[in-house]
Amino acid sequence: MEITFLGTSSGVPTRNRNVSSIALRLPQRAELWLFDCGEGTQHQFLRSEVKISQLTRIFITHLHGDHIFGLMGLLASSGLAGSGQGIEIYGPEGLGDYLEACCRFSSTHLGKRLKVHTVRENGLIYEDKDFQVHCGLLKHRIPAYGYRVEEKQRPGRFNVEQAEALGIPFGPIYGQLKQGKTVTLEDGRRIRGQDLCEPPEPGRKFVYCTDTVFCEEAIALAQEADLLVHEATFAHQDAQLAFDRLHSTSTMAAQVALLANVKQLIMTHFSPRYAPGNPLQLENLLAEAQAIFPNTRLARDFLTVEIPRRTADPAIAMSTPQASPA
């Protein structure tokens, strides 16, 4: 389970940063989920290791252009009208109308493989055997939703050696024991599966909050997350701009991380005003956040972040981008 940042700038792209988009890779099922799709996102796919062919779900936070202007181009290029798997999109009310209008005026036909789910309230919006996705209404100028992806806990490792020592015959019975069930052997012995399994492995939690000013819903959504990606459009000294435009500062993002007891915070969605050469730069925002929540990082385009299993090293590993800057 890992994420790749495809865009980390707010409002407009810069020479080194595209606008918002994050890809969540689920390697165990060769599947890719996308969060937001700013202008140029499909170009970022081409410059990265993530594959459009694995894309199955897109989660849109809100309908501002820097989060959706790349959506139509990406969908048109993804082969929805032909063979291959479909794509399901989740987002605020109006997203379906936007896509319909784009298709109508551009004479684009996406076929029947696209399904749009309108998000209208907090709560569970998707679930399968491995994952749950919840959304929460944030505080922005238009309806904006944060998303929480939660992996379900996995059964603990089955102790085959112990089972063999007990004389349990290999076969379908092992599958029942792995599920923690109690089985009765032919000789009358009752074996509890839970006695042959290690403790269940907790699932991982990834939370994405943007665009928003500091709010209680972000804290609730991010509770105990392994990784929180939170917008930090402004520096602390520009807090009035954040309140006026309902965006977050670096210190607001850090406060959410602290109050939600997350493991790691990665800030994104930076205003171009902090680009290199300006009096205040992103390193200053990082220092502000780390003073509140030390385990904070800055996102950059093409950065890939692995979210390790809870039984692994608790430190989240960060790999070096392999692609050239956008």
Curated annotation (Swiss-Prot):
**Cofactor entry:** Zn(2+)
Question: For binding Zn(2+) 1, which residues are annotated in this chain's numbering?
Answer: 62, 64, 140, 211
Tell me yes or no: is Endoplasmic reticulum among this UniProt entry's keywords: no
Q: So which domain of life are we looking at? A: Bacteria
Q: What is its EC number?
A: 3.1.26.11
Q: Where is the active site?
A: 66
Quote the catalytic activity from the record: Endonucleolytic cleavage of RNA, removing extra 3' nucleotides from tRNA precursor, generating 3' termini of tRNAs. A 3'-hydroxy group is left at the tRNA terminus and a 5'-phosphoryl group is left at the trailer molecule
Cofactor mode of binding and number, as noted: Binds 2 Zn(2+) ions.
The entry describes its oligomerization and partners as: Homodimer.
Task: Name the family the entry cites.
Answer: Belongs to the RNase Z family.
Q: What is this protein called?
A: Ribonuclease Z
